[in-house]
Amino acid sequence: VMTYFSPAVFDGKVIMQGDNIKATGMGSSQMDQYAETAQPGEFSVWSDAMFGGMPYVTGYGQAAPSMPSYSIVDGWLKKVGYGDAAMVFTGLVCFYLLMCVMGVNWWLAIAGAFAFAFASYNIIIIEAGHIVKAYVIGYMPVTLAGMALLFRRSYLWGAVLFLLGVALSLANGHIQITYYLVLLCLLIYVGYAVRKIK
């Protein structure tokens, strides 16, 4: 991961993430108003710069203010390269964890982790600047590993991993991908239930 992103990590170069540039423009009036008039704890959730006005529930460069911070869990990781290398490393570690929980050989787990983390879509969304989307996708395997442990009656570690995965998904603030995670969890639950009934 560090080799792939070495220009960004070691040379200080920046990936020009187009959607981040656009988001800066879309949220500039809101951020200006926030800087001039906001009291502590106040945050505008409406932007007049997009489509003639629409909700703007995640601020420029920050999670929604009502969400707790989980920087103690993933803050060290995001220091590696928040907008590039850390996202891929998150996917590597989390998918490797899922494969280990599923009982896969370590070498196959490593291969699967690389396949997951370096999937073309993940690289495309990094270039586009969909940072929180990439993190939520990267944390999905933690939730799934927790589910697998819960179904194997390993309740303590299953609950810890499941709740940690859900918390990190919500804290990173990409509701669409979290919604897809909920649908995936429901499908897996139905599959386990059908298998259990048979």
Can you name each region flagged by the protein language model?
Residues 90-102, 106-195:
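Membrane-embedded helix bundles of polyisoprenyl
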Residues 2-95, 114-141:
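Membrane-interface coil-to-helix junctions
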